[in-house]
Amino acid sequence: MSGPVRTEPLHGETPLLASSGSYSVVVLLRGYAEPQGVGDAVRADGTVTLVLPRGWVSDTSRRLAPSADGGAKTALEEAVRGPILVDTGGPWTRDALLEALATQGVAPGDVTLVVGTHGHSDHIGNLGLFPQAALLVSHDFCLPGGLYLPHGLCETQPLILGSGLQVWATPGHGGQRDVSVVVEGTSLGTVVVVGDVFERLGDEDSWQDLSEDPVAQQRSRERILSVADVVVPGHGAPFRVVREAVKSSED
């Protein structure tokens, strides 16, 4: 029986590397938010995460662009056959992003899907590096060339991208159209890449001031904590979610 939930630092590899039978999850660039001591100025950048299909090998010469013939569902299924990038960081980290991708054997042209968790510049500032990728930015899904397709994503209806891979609607921080990526069955359990639904471990003192809809964001946070074993936040290190068992009256 599940009881109270708490969060704690995740000890282990940096960057986070969690693998499953279907996907690996790698934090390429860890986000940060650092007060600058001048009024409310903050220097910040968002976390960038790579979701890599198991057994994927770079071969852009044989790559086929996702097709619109079968609608959004088919196009998304085709897009997740290659590397998936969750957020891109700000344009000021362009070189760092390219270098981090290269360390994983991924070139910009290899990326088949970019998921932007929300529309802030520190999270989608490098979309221009991936003109050949399908884009799911907030709730907008488009194929290369700007063909937009409806898909039906909402809080009660996730997008199923593949076995153990989903996109959830998690509104709040940036308004009503934020999304998170859920990867199930990894070596660390269920990993949820959340954008700024969680800024960092221990953000309880600050997230509401940064939220466009705190009520919706609280709902999103609770939903994520109910399933996640590891959370990848927008501006800090990944952290673990611990569910404490509640003893029954018979114990």
From Swiss-Prot:
Residues annotated as binding Zn(2+) 2: 122-123, 196, 235
Gene from which this protein is expressed: Mblac1
Location in the cell: Cytoplasm, Cytosol; Nucleus
Co-factor requirement: Zn(2+)
GO BP terms in the entry: histone mRNA metabolic process; mRNA 3'-end processing; positive regulation of G1/S transition of mitotic cell cycle
Keyword field: Cytoplasm, Hydrolase, Metal-binding, Nucleus, Zinc
Annotated residues for binding of Zn(2+) 1: 118, 120, 173, 196
Function of the protein: Endoribonuclease that catalyzes the hydrolysis of histone-coding pre-mRNA 3'-end. Involved in histone pre-mRNA processing during the S-phase of the cell cycle, which is required for entering/progressing through S-phase. Cleaves histone pre-mRNA at a major and a minor cleavage site after the 5'-ACCCA-3' and the 5'-ACCCACA-3' sequence, respectively, and located downstream of the stem-loop. May require the presence of the HDE element located at the histone pre-RNA 3'-end to avoid non-specific cleavage.
GO molecular function, one term: RNA endonuclease activity
Subunit structure: Homodimer.
Cofactor remark: Binds 2 Zn(2+) ions per subunit.
Known catalytic reactions: a ribonucleotidyl-ribonucleotide-RNA + H2O = a 3'-end ribonucleotide-RNA + a 5'-end 5'-phospho-ribonucleoside-RNA + H(+)
Main enzyme class: hydrolase
Family: Belongs to the metallo-beta-lactamase superfamily. Glyoxalase II family.
Protein name per Swiss-Prot or TrEMBL: Metallo-beta-lactamase domain-containing protein 1
Domain text: Contains four of the five characteristic MBL-fold metal-binding motifs, with two waters completing metal coordination.
GO CC list: cytoplasm; cytosol; nucleus
Organism from which the protein derives: Rattus norvegicus (Rat)
InterPro entries: MBLAC1, Metallo-B-lactamas, RibonucZ/Hydroxyglut_hydro
EC code(s) of this entry: 3.1.27.-
